[in-house]
């Protein structure tokens, strides 16, 4: 299975740098079996069935992008930091730009209320230990940090105050992600309430999306690719809700690839169970889904592991046709773009 099998041409004009407003105004490509319909997210009330269960990732994105100053004698250097994940040894793993200007033991000052020491420096990243912890750290980070927009947006514009709302789901509650579960950005409270009134159930799980979600695949044989690990949890209550829906013949529909990867990780034994830990599950064509019946997701990058995931769900040829339709009909791509609802069979 070659990496080139998952390539496609995408006009740059289709890369969204701002989301649709309101959230539910985003377009929705409904693909069920061989059928494609051009709809909008607000139409989901008439698309989902009573008895369906949507699985939502309730992770909360932290303002992980920091700009600080390293002082060495009378010389000062501007340092850009992107937090990646909590480090096992304490502190945070982070990317630094320029990394070469930092030495272990040096301090980076981000604001009057927040500084960090370079505890370890590697070839590609470093470990920072901040001078605050707990709620004090959260408050200082909220003041000094900016939302960590994906590279394909950050290359086109800087993050601003509006991104603090736009790049966060309305049900975000557990802080720890450095990228949003973007399919969930399309939901607002009125849509959630309308779906619930129509008999659609919801289950929340937590997967802290890491910066590794944007890493490119560097091998031509995709089966040899190693996925980054991300921390997640499916509680006992969540597992029971999903199992009950399956037993009743309802559909389990993750909203986003992060929720899908998590519930499939929690179903390694064949049925879903409570689960907590790091997952590096890599889903590509040939994978047999255990609990997922359909998927709501945005449109993904060429040659990405997420494009491989949707190809596993729908079939490679079918996904090529779906993406060709999306490009021809000017759907907006990636994190702030439009959505698709992928339903195999039909």
UniProtKB/Swiss-Prot annotation:
Main enzyme class: transferase
Keywords linked to the UniProt accession: Cytoplasm, Queuosine biosynthesis, S-adenosyl-L-methionine, Transferase
Localization annotation: Cytoplasm
Catalytic activity: 7-aminomethyl-7-carbaguanosine(34) in tRNA + S-adenosyl-L-methionine = epoxyqueuosine(34) in tRNA + adenine + L-methionine + 2 H(+)
HAMAP family documented for this protein: QueA
Similarity-based family: Belongs to the QueA family.
Protein name from the UniProt record: S-adenosylmethionine:tRNA ribosyltransferase-isomerase
Name of the gene: queA
């Amino acid at each position: 299975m070659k990496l080139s099998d998952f390539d496609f041409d995408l006009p740059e004009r289709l890369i969204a740098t701002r989301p649709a407003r309101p959230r539910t105004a985003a377009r929705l490509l409904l693909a069920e079996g061989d059928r494609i319909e051009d709809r909008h997210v607000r139409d989901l009330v008439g698309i989902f069935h009573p008895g369906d269960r949507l699985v939502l990732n309730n992770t909360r994105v932290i303002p992980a992008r920091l700009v600080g100053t390293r002082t060495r004698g009378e010389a000062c250097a501007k340092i850009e930091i992107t937090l990646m994940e909590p480090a096992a040894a304490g502190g945070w793993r982070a990317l630094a730009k320029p990394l070469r200007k930092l030495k272990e033991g040096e301090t980076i000052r981000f604001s009057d209320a927040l500084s960090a020491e370079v505890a370890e420096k590697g070839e590609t990243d470093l470990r920072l230990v901040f001078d605050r912890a707990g709620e004090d750290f959260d408050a200082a980070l909220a003041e000094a940090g900016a939302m960590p927009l994906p590279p394909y947006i950050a290359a086109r514009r800087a993050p601003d105050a509006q991104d603090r709302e736009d790049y966060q789901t309305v049900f975000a509650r557990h802080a720890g992600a450095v990228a949003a579960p973007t399919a969930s950005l399309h939901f607002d409270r009125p849509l959630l309430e309308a779906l619930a009134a129509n008999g659609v159930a919801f289950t929340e799980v937590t997967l802290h999306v890491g910066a590794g979600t944007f890493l490119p695949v560097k091998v031509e044989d995709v089966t040899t690719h190693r996925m980054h690990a991300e921390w997640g949890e499916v509680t006992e209550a969540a597992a029971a809700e999903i199992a009950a829906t399956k037993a009743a013949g309802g559909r389990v529909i993750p909203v986003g690839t992060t929720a899908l990867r998590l519930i499939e990780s929690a179903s390694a034994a064949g049925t879903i169970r409570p689960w907590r830990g790091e997952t590096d599950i890599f889903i590509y064509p040939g994978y047999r889904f255990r609990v997922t019946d359909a998927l709501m997701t945005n449109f993904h990058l060429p040659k990405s592991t997420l494009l491989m995931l949707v190809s596993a769900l729908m079939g490679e040829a079918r996904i090529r046709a779906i993406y060709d339709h999306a490009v021809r009909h000017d759907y907006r791509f990636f994190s702030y773009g439009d959505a698709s609802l992928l339903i195999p069979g039909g």
